[in-house]
Every structure is written in C-alpha cells, then in structure tokens.
C-alpha cells in the first residue's frame, strides 16, 4: 500500500524536482501539496506548485497557499538562487487549475482528518505552515506519522556561517517542529551537500528525452550556474529537497543517526542554527533522525530511473 504523504514546499528548483520524484513513485500517495514562502514570495511559490502540477498532468491534487510570512519575523527570500520566478530556466506551462479556497493549514488538517492512516508530512521549505498546523490542531498530532524536513545542518550554514536557509527564515517555527514530540527526520546540509548533481548527470537526465526529464535538466542548468561560485567548492549543485523523498523511497541509500536537535532563535551570530547534540552532551533524549550521508550515485540513479516514468 502506498505511503500517504502531504508535501509542503516553496518551489524553488529543488522543490520542483522533489515534486517530480514524488509523483513518479507509486510507493507514495501524494494527498495534497501546500506552498510556503521562502525561495520566492508566497504568490510565486504557490504559482510554481500549480505550474509543476500542470506540467505533470496532476491537476487532481489539492493545492493551497500558506502563510505569507514567518511566525515572528519579516520574510527573507532566496531570489539570488532561484531567480525572479523562483523557477528560472525552463519554459513552464501556465497553471490550468486553481488552488483550493482555503489556507494551507486548513488543507493539511482536512487531509489528516480524512486519511485512514497516519500521514507523513514532507516539508522542504521554512517550517511556518507545519508549525501553525501543530499549534492550531493538537488533536491531529496522532494522525501525523512523521515530519521529514529539508533544513538545518550539524556544521556549516549556507545562508549565514551557522544557519541553513530554510531554518533561518523561520527558526521559531522549526523549533516548534523539533520539540513537538512527533518523529522528525532532518535532511540537512550534511547530507544534501553530498547529493550533488554533476553536469554529466544533467545530460543523462536530458537524454531520457521526455518533456519532464527535459524540464528537470533545464532546471538543473540554471541551478548549476549559481553553484559554480568557487566559495562553495562544489563539483555540481546540491539537490537538497529531493533527499527527503529519496529517503522515503530508498532509505538504504542514506546514513542516519538519532540525536537531539534544537534551534537557536536568538543568538547574535547563530540565529537559525540547528544545534545537534552529536556527542550526547545535554542528556536530552533524541528527538530526530538526522541524515548525515548518501550514496550519491545511487541517488542519481534513482532520479534517472523515476524520470522514465514520464515517457
């Protein structure tokens, strides 16, 4: 039986590819998709969800737009990474359908209530919508199997020296998620910076030759350009968000540890830092499965295999 998931995302090139991977995988049943503000403004990320589902001919999936700003802060966006539209590069179709006439939290709650079994929430943007859901619907916590997030890092940040972008945008929301008591899986920069797509991988995807694989290759063409900056020291571009979906599909490709994680919300230099108690120094009981490594070639092979679904 397919695993029911609810995807909360802020497309974003890597979010878009996470959507592609999830919808090409019969092991997963995508119940709904909600949009968060982060990689671009809330209007643009919602539009990008609709554009991707139009491309994939999955306009049957309910979509709703989320919070327009973080819980306690002004919104920061990553337009320097993802471009003016949030999905610069390929020519994507205009949406052929509209979002639901409700908020992201309302759609999430409805999805959880109506599901016969607990739902896995996959969140690949800031955690604002998920935190709002947890705070406003404590009666539905038991309907959440786990929360798989792309965010954080045990080590170096990518937005500040200490903080990864998704957590930095709304650290208060991320702290609510980590301390919720619901199982959390964290795909942070420790693993996603190892899940790099090289130029030759992009050409492999392009050679598959269907419209979706071509779009994915064109998304990666744009994404690779940003990551050529020598400061990163990358061979390719880290494909952050699809790591969440890939872990659900093939956990054997990944190495994980069970640790306690907290989020710094006030530090002068460390706002948005995920503090991972790797050496069990706090005495706190582990609250997260932290993904720390990936079989890069296996990850690329999985993407290539699933892109053939769209032939």
Curated annotation (Swiss-Prot):
Active site per UniProt: 240
GO annotation terms (biological process): nucleobase-containing small molecule interconversion; purine nucleoside catabolic process; pyrimidine nucleobase metabolic process
Superkingdom of the organism of origin: Bacteria
GO MF entry, a single one: uridine nucleosidase activity
Alphabetical keyword list: Glycosidase, Hydrolase
EC number: 3.2.-.-
Pfam families the UniProt entry points to: IU_nuc_hydro
GO cellular component: cytosol
Stated family: Belongs to the IUNH family. RihA subfamily.
PANTHER family: INOSINE-URIDINE PREFERRING NUCLEOSIDE HYDROLASE, URIDINE NUCLEOSIDASE
Functional description taken from the UniProt entry: Hydrolyzes cytidine or uridine to ribose and cytosine or uracil, respectively.
Name by which UniProt lists this protein: Pyrimidine-specific ribonucleoside hydrolase RihA
Species for this entry: Shigella flexneri
